[in-house]
Amino acid sequence: MTLHYDGPTLTLVVNPAAGGGRARRVLPQVTRDLLIGLPGASLRVFQTGSFAEARLRCIAAAEQARPAVEGTMADSLLVMGGDGMMHLGLNACARTQVPLGLIPAGTGNDFCGGLGIHGGTPGAVRTIVSGATARIDLTSVRGKLAGGA
């Protein structure tokens, strides 16, 4: 049997209203930087119109992700927006091996700041392209997962 690897699929779920519309404005540059920085990757982008849609897109991406095989990058879920999007991505990828990329584009971006993700949206994209990863501890609060460094 021959296995063919087409490269990883990155699913980017975006809250375009985050940061007063900032996420929508920077999305073209984010997608360019991801595609240039990860030339073998496929990028699927979903601009969501509601919390429910964003949640479903995150869950679907995590469920459909292919794991890494020797010498390759795994399919990944990327979320872009404010702390609410970070929370959705975290809950979708928890208890899986699916890598989660966080791209802050909200107003405060407290979650990313607490994890040491600095440099705003461009810095987060550079970190994703570099392949840097970190595991974080999770706790459950009223049935929902929360993460921290």
List PLM regions with ranges.
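Glycine-rich beta-strand-to-loop/alpha-helix junction loops that act as flexible
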Residues: 16, 80-82, 103-105
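Conserved beta-strand-loop-alpha-helix hinge of the TIR/SEFIR fold
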Residues: 76-96
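ATP/NTP phosphate-donor binding region
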Residues: 1-77, 87, 123-126
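Short amphipathic alpha-helical segments
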Residues: 24-26, 89-93, 113-115
